[in-house]
Every structure is written in C-alpha cells, then in structure tokens.
Amino acid sequence: MRQRTIVCPLIQNDGCYLLCKMADNRGVFPGQWALSGGGVEPGERIEEALRREIREELGEQLILSDITPWTFRDDIRVKTYADGRQEEIYMIYLIFDCVSANRDICINDEFQDYAWVRPEEFALYDLNVATRHTLRLKGLL
C-alpha cells in the first residue's frame, strides 16, 4: 500500500471556514465537501508543500496572514482517479490552522465549488468523514 503525507489547511476568515466541494469523478471523497490540501512531494519542505497546494487548488490571490501547525492524524483512504481507477492509500494528515487576509479564491478542477461557512452552518453541507473528524477535533462541530 502506498503512503502519502498530506498537508491540509483549515482556513478561517472573519469567523468563516473555507470548504471545497470535490469533483464528482475523482479524489478521495468525490462530490463531498472537504478542506483543501494535498500531498507533499519528495524533497519538499512541509510549509512549502502547504503553500504550493493552496496556490494550485485555490489560486494565487488568496493571502494567508497566519499559518500555525495544529495537529496530525492518519487513516487509510480509497482514492478515485479521473479514469475510474481506485487505489487504497495510507495517509498521514498534517493539519494547519490558517487565517486568510482575504477571500479571493479561484478553484482548480479538483473542486466544483467552494464556500465560506460559519460553524453553525456546517450541518447544511455533506462533509466527508475526514473533514467532520477534523472539525470535531477543533471543537467546531
């Protein structure tokens, strides 16, 4: 089984948290709402990976005014590729508290939508199990 280290930002702006709706045909949780993030590349430092993933998935315009390592956890997940192929992966999640100075987002094709959500509105979203777990750990759900 392949192992991946995943950097995952929990991005907050003015009391709202950024959620991204995964594309329907790919990813670890197709069609569900999630936190952004992705894998650390070989030779890449953790914060470099976090900033790269944010740029790739959320665009160049989002400005983070604060990044603080928060927690980690691990899990085994099934990733679905665009061609329908699936792979079981052991994932180590490194989760960061992030504060954004703005809400300027330009999502890539990994996502079909995004929303800035107040904690009391989380129940209105089909959150994937990993995101629900993270939000519970943070005391937001």
Swiss-Prot record:
* Function field: Catalyzes the hydrolysis of nucleoside triphosphates, with a preference for pyrimidine deoxynucleoside triphosphates (dUTP, dTTP and dCTP).
Residue span of motif Nudix box? 38-59
Q: What's one GO MF term for it?
A: dUTP diphosphatase activity
Q: How does it assemble?
A: Monomer.
Q: Which UniProt keywords apply?
A: Hydrolase, Magnesium
Q: What is this protein called?
A: Nucleoside triphosphatase NudI
- Domain annotation Nudix hydrolase: ranges: 1-141
Give the source's domain of life in one word.
Bacteria
* Species name: Salmonella arizonae (strain ATCC BAA-731 / CDC346-86 / RSK2980)
Known EC number? 3.6.1.9, 3.6.1.12, 3.6.1.-, 3.6.1.23
Q: Name one Pfam family in it.
A: NUDIX
Name the catalysed reactions.
Answer: a ribonucleoside 5'-triphosphate + H2O = a ribonucleoside 5'-phosphate + diphosphate + H(+); a 2'-deoxyribonucleoside 5'-triphosphate + H2O = a 2'-deoxyribonucleoside 5'-phosphate + diphosphate + H(+); dUTP + H2O = dUMP + diphosphate + H(+); dTTP + H2O = dTMP + diphosphate + H(+)
> What cofactor does its activity depend on?
Mg(2+)
Q: Which family does it belong to?
A: Belongs to the Nudix hydrolase family. NudI subfamily.
- Is the Protein biosynthesis keyword given for this protein? no
Signal peptide span: none
Magnesium among the record's keywords?
A: yes
